[in-house]
């Protein structure tokens, strides 16, 4: 329970908002081993905003639920299926009598992920994810992402290589896809993508000795349409001249 006038200068407590104010909620989560090789996890999060917030010009209420089923048939194979739905009111783009009114925005993610180790040197990860987004009475927009990861760590060498090839397509920016990417030490990378295209990245790590490590990373995104606008992690618009961004 965070009051709407709570001052959050140095707080970073749990909540739906990025700041700890103007929010009441209830979160319930559970994790259970239902069978010898199956684990079921999930949560339900209900949240209420007693006062106005960004892009929401009235008090509002929403919920977020998540369920994931893990199956581990062997020590070298792990797979899971996940579904997550978040519903929260937002301002409609239409203004009636100079008043913004709220409509429900529903975003649902369906994900299937498989990771398997061929041996001690090679590991592979496959993922396919579908996103649906519906706002008010507007048509549902969809998006998808598919990627293949390859991880190689040769025996006898303090070297590791990770590479990914990904395909993505979305019908709108609201149906954009997020993916975590391995990065150099102390860097965090969770980019998002909209439109249609592909992406590749490779990360190489070599341990020279116990005090020195070398990291090299290269990534490139290819867009089907040239001269596209993308939203960067900082929230500003960036123009890609051509159809490649490295």
Functional labels for PLM-detected ranges:
Residues 1-246:
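Exposed, low-structure sequence patches enriched in small/polar residues
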């Amino acid at each position: 329970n965070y009051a709407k006038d709570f001052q959050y200068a140095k707080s970073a407590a749990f909540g739906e908002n990025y700041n700890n104010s103007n929010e009441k909620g209830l979160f319930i989560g559970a994790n259970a081993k239902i069978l010898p090789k199956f684990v079921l996890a999930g949560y339900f999060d209900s949240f209420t905003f007693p006062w106005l917030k960004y892009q929401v010009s009235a008090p509002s209420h929403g919920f977020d639920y998540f369920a994931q089923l893990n199956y581990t048939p062997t020590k070298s194979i792990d797979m899971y299926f996940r579904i997550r739905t978040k519903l929260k009111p937002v301002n409609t783009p239409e203004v009636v009598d100079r008043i913004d009114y709220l409509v429900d925005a529903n975003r649902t993610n369906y994900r299937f992920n498989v990771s398997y180790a061929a041996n001690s040197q090679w590991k592979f990860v496959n993922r396919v994810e579908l996103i649906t987004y519906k706002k008010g009475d507007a048509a549902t927009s969809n998006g998808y992402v598919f990627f293949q990861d390859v991880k190689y760590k040769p025996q006898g060498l303090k070297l590791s290589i990770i590479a990914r090839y990904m395909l993505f397509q979305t019908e709108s920016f609201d149906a954009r896809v997020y993916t975590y990417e391995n990065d150099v030490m102390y860097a965090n990378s969770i980019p998002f993508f909209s439109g249609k295209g592909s992406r590749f990245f490779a990360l190489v790590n070599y341990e020279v000795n116990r005090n020195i490590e070398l990291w090299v990373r290269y990534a490139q995104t290819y867009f089907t349409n040239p001269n596209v606008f993308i939203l960067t992690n900082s929230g500003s618009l960036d123009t890609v001249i051509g159809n490649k961004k490295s």
